[in-house]
Curated annotation (Swiss-Prot):
Binding site for substrate: 38, 186
Pfam family, one: HK
UniProt name for this protein: Hydroxyethylthiazole kinase
Keywords: ATP-binding, Kinase, Magnesium, Metal-binding, Nucleotide-binding, Thiamine biosynthesis, Transferase
Gene: thiM
Protein EC: 2.7.1.50
Organism: Streptococcus agalactiae serotype Ia (strain ATCC 27591 / A909 / CDC SS700)
Amino acid sequence: MYLEQLKEVNPLTICITNNVVKNFTANGLLALGASPAMSECIEDLEDLLKVADALLINIGTLTKESWQLYQEAIKIANKNQVPVVLDPVAAGASRFRLEVSLDLLKNYSISLLRGNGSEIAALIGEKQASKGADGGKVADLESIAVKANQVFDVPVVVTGETDAIAVRGEVRLLQNGSPLMPLVTGTGCLLGAVLAAFIGSSDRSDDLACLTEAMTVYNVAGEIAEKVAKGKGVGSFQVAFLDALSQMKSEMIMDK
């Protein structure tokens, strides 16, 4: 349902994301059926966000200048009622990253918070091991998702071996995906953009259902890619993953 709607709407998804993943993110969105724009010029965004369907803010390659860009872009998105997805990459790795993430969450309207366990744990003040964007192992992603949902009053997606989605106090746990996905730089960052595209093309009447389908589509594509690339390595997996995203249909996830 939501995937077909995305393909029909072809949502314009503005991605202010990190320098490492821009190409992969744009290609992933195109494969799925969305329309990516990677602009980082405020004068440009003033017009683009009037017609955009979603905005992704990914703080991966953070600078003082980019912090100001995030703030200005979110202000414009909020003014135009464009949903904003925040990916607080490595929020627990430095005080500066934590400060920026909390500023954006507390002072602007964010539609979805997406991160791994250690990133979201850092935002709610829980001590967890963090190794940059990959994060450390977190025992209870469900409780972290629930608490973050309560603290920030925003839908939350926490990714790990089991993914947790929390919306208005309701939680859903998902276990699809491939162990090869974390071995390709940008799969987590692309996920943030994919979630933005799904939200941006929906009517927002049931975020939990929308996010559940988005996560399942993404993770099942990873499973398909793993089978295709078996014995070939992570380079082949990356290509197979983009291929799988381009071929996904809702019926492929009916029993997942």
